[in-house]
Every structure is written in C-alpha cells, then in structure tokens.
C-alpha cells in the first residue's frame, strides 16, 4: 500500500512517517518531504497526487497559528485546502483505499458533560477550531466517493514538539533549573496523549481500513496545568515558583477538555494501554536534558 502523509514535516507527521516506514508494510511519502504541497493551489495538490499515486492518504497538513492575526488564512488552508485535496483525489481517482483526516478536539468547545464524545454537537470557540469544523462538513460531502475517517486528537505530547508549546516550555524550564516560570491558567484541564500512541493508533486505523467514522484520539483522563507542574517537580527533583501572567490566559480558553475514548477502544480493543502522562514527561525531560548538555 502506498501512503501519502500531508503535513509530513510537522510534529505528528514526522513521527507518523517514521513509524509507518519502520513497519515496512507500506511505501510512505511525505507531501512536505518529497515535494511541497500547497493546499491552497489545486495545481500543486494535483501535481503531488499524480507523482505519488497513493492508495491511502493521511491528511495532517493544517494551519494552527496565524502570526499576522488574519483568521481568513485558517479557512483558506484548513477548509478550502481540504476541499482542493478531496476534489483532486476524486478527479484523479487515487486513494481508493481511503483517507484519514485530522480535525481537532477543539471543535467541541465548552460542553456540559465531563467526557466529550463524538456524538456531541460541536461548539468551536476560535477560528482554528471553526475552520476544522467546516473541514468536517467538507469531508461529509465527499464520503459518497471515498471512505473517509475523521480523527479528533486531544493534546498530543512527546519528543520533537515545538518548545513554544506549554508543556515543552515547562519541561525546558525544569531542565534549566529556573527559579521561576510564568504560566497562565493553572486550572485548565486537558487530556494528554503520547505522540507515539497517537501514531500507533493511526497505524491501526489504516491497517483496519476504518471508513466513514469520526473518532476521538484521547485517553479519557484529564490533568490540570498545575498537576503537570507538580509531576515535573517530582521528576526533576526541583522546586520552582510560579508567577501567573494574565497575558498568557487566552480569552477563549476552554476550562476542561477530556475525551471519551469508548469509540476508539471499540476499534483498538479494551485492553489497549495508553502511555502514562508521567512516562511521557519523563521521556521529554531526559531528552531535553541531553539536548542542553551537548
């Protein structure tokens, strides 16, 4: 099976391509490794598809941050870009075995229930999540042509994540033995999942050729920012003072996001074991320690 991964140079993309190639069951192409794919340019999309002729596509490429604060760009890349990709797939008759599109858990927004299941009505609160919600509607339009599964990952953690993200930033501060750290809302609760587990789950979904489903990638367990801080204190055996900075508190912050993994476990099997948050943090801490000692 020939698999094309869009967004192959990103955090999850790099890890996924590595895992799939390691399995030696697939011929794997990264759309940003072999050739750059501009999702906003239909000709660029078609060029990559014509050259790779994939049997299956994992669509990871997305814009998660806009430096110039222009929200239109989110929709051009995440929504219209997905339209360009899916239309080209049908026109060129590729990816006959299916497509797996990455959405985001952020589309749930603020809900009344503790565990967020796929059956809930999305209530996205920012343009990134809104653009992904629109993307899911685009996917529905093409499900009569291809088997397309949408995954909604919660907070993915692990090696290779940008240091500007919250947890890698905290890990780095503990490795450097900083005396203080500036944080925003300490009570925000998130469902953290290992990038290795995330990629393993994608591999299993591809292998099973799951079609036309929407599935959370989550553990069902939530940790607050303060709990992550406490775990890092234990791992590093270092105490640090927290200074809360209101500038780090997002106006659209969702207080709690914990996924319901029931549907995922129905596919994987109820005996599937997720990597613990402590184990993820320990690996990140040790790796950062090595990086800074070189």
UniProtKB/Swiss-Prot annotation:
Binding site for substrate: 104, 128, 155, 190
Main EC class the enzyme belongs to: oxidoreductase
SUPFAM superfamilies: NAD(P)-binding Rossmann-fold domains
Pfam family, one: Epimerase
Ligand binding (NAD(+)): 11-12, 38-39, 60-64, 104, 128, 132, 154
Matching InterPro entries: Epimerase_deHydtase, NAD(P)-bd_dom_sf
Protein name as it appears in the record: GDP-6-deoxy-D-talose 4-dehydrogenase
Cysteine pairs bridged by disulfides in the record: none
Family membership: Belongs to the NAD(P)-dependent epimerase/dehydratase family.
GO biological process, one term: O antigen biosynthetic process
Active site annotation, chain numbering: 128 (proton acceptor)
Function: Catalyzes the conversion of GDP-4-dehydro-6-deoxy-D-mannose to GDP-6-deoxy-D-talose.
Record pathway: Bacterial outer membrane biogenesis; LPS O-antigen biosynthesis
Catalytic activity, EC: 1.1.1.135
Reactions the enzyme catalyzes: GDP-6-deoxy-alpha-D-talose + NAD(+) = GDP-4-dehydro-alpha-D-rhamnose + NADH + H(+); GDP-6-deoxy-alpha-D-talose + NADP(+) = GDP-4-dehydro-alpha-D-rhamnose + NADPH + H(+)
A molecular-function term among this protein's GO annotations: GDP-6-deoxy-D-talose 4-dehydrogenase activity
Gene behind this protein: tld
This protein's UniProt keywords: Lipopolysaccharide biosynthesis, NAD, Oxidoreductase
């Amino acid at each position: 099976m020939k698999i094309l991964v869009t967004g192959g140079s990103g955090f999850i993309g790099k890890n996924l391509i590595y895992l799939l190639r390691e399995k030696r069951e697939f011929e794997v192409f990264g759309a940003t490794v072999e050739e750059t794919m501009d999702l906003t340019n239909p000709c660029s999309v078609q060029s990559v598809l014509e050259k790779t002729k994939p049997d299956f596509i994992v669509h990871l490429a997305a814009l998660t941050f806009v430096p110039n604060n222009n929200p239109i760009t989110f929709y051009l890349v995440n929504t219209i870009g997905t339209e360009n990709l899916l239309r080209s797939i049908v026109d060129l008759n590729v990816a006959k075995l299916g497509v797996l599109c990455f959405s985001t858990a952020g589309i749930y927004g603020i809900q009344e229930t503790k565990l967020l299941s796929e059956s809930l009505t999305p209530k996205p609160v920012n343009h990134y999540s809104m653009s992904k919600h629109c993307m899911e509607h685009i996917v529905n339009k093409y499900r009569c042509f291809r088997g397309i599964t949408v995954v909604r990952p919660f907070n993915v953690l692990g090696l290779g994540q940008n240091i500007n993200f919250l947890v890698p930033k905290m890990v780095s501060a503990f490795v450097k033995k900083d005396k203080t750290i500036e944080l925003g809302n300490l009570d925000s609760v998130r469902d953290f999942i290992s990038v290795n587990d995330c990629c393993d789950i994608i591999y299993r979904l591809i292998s099973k050729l799951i079609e036309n489903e929407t599935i959370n990638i989550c553990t069902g367990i939530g940790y607050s920012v303060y709990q992550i801080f406490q775990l890092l204190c234990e791992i590093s055996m270092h105490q640090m003072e927290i200074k809360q900075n209101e500038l780090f508190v997002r106006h659209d912050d969702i207080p709690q996001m914990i996924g319901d993994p029931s549907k995922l476990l129905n596919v994987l099997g109820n005996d599937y074991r997720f990597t613990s948050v402590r184990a993820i943090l320990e690996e990140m801490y040790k790796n950062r320690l090595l990086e800074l000692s070189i």
